Amino acid sequence: MVAAKKTKKSLESINSRLQLVMKSGKYVLGYKQSQKMIRQGKAKLVILANNCPALRKSEIEYYAMLSKTGVHHYSGNNIELGTACGKYYRVCTLAIIDPGDSDIIRSMPDQQQGEK
């Protein structure tokens, strides 16, 4: 019960930070565009939905590791990630280039340490 409440709270904070990135920052949606930004070294953080295909997930993680880009595994599926981004379509992969006014990049390592 307590763990479920904590994950809901962290999900809400991630969603609110994502909305701020959508308004004030620069980002790309989609696998191909995200991979392109990672290879160019422009991506600061990559967010993957939990139902992202395994091959795509491993490729993104590999390229992110090479370019020293952070990867966050979003706890919702691609429909929920799309909704969190304010889009009416599914989003499996999202790369944040410039967070704008959001502190999403600084807050992600804390979130990941809490999950382990």
Curated annotation (Swiss-Prot):
One of its GO terms (molecular function) is RNA binding. It is found in: Cytoplasm. InterPro entries: Ribosomal_eL30, Ribosomal_eL30-like, Ribosomal_eL30-like_sf, Ribosomal_eL30_CS, Ribosomal_eL8/eL30/eS12/Gad45. HAMAP family: Ribosomal_eL30. Keywords: Cytoplasm, Ribonucleoprotein, Ribosomal protein. The keyword Ribonucleoprotein applies. Gene3D superfamilies: 3.30.1330.30. Belongs to the eukaryotic ribosomal protein eL30 family. Component of the large ribosomal subunit. It comes from the Eukaryota. The keyword Cytoplasm applies. GO terms for cellular component: cytosolic large ribosomal subunit. SUPFAM superfamilies: L30e-like. This is Large ribosomal subunit protein eL30. Its main location: cytoplasm. Component of the large ribosomal subunit. The ribosome is a large ribonucleoprotein complex responsible for the synthesis of proteins in the cell.
